[in-house]
Amino acid sequence: MLYSKGKATTTYSIHVKQSEFAKQLGISRQALNVHLRKLRLNSYVRTGRGFIDVTEKGLALLGVSVNPAFVFIKVSPLRRSEAYQRLIELPIQRVFRVAGDMDAVLFVERERLDDALRKLAAIDGIQETKSYVTIETLK
């Protein structure tokens, strides 16, 4: 029931204890809690035991688009294993291996598309790429 009533959203999660995160920021856990409470009240983050999620509203505030770019990749059959390993190491949201005319699909933040394409150009075995930037999310 929860799944059928739910809505797909984009969030970024950090899995860290708040005490550890506060230490990394150089503030007390209590000070972090005050800041997080304000962010929660404005729906910018969700928090729980051991995690902080940045919501779509929070991402928009940070200037991160929730409408991604997709990069379709054709890989040389002789280089697939090493090319796939290099794709996994890229700082992108998701990598999918697919069947059909192309071999992989990357799910990339629009703001990181240029960087991703530069890094793809340096991977041996990448024969072709096609990039598509989404305009809006319809559903």
Where do the model's predicted regions map?
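A compositional/biophysical signature of low hydrophobicity enriched in polar/charged and small residues
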Residues: M1-K139
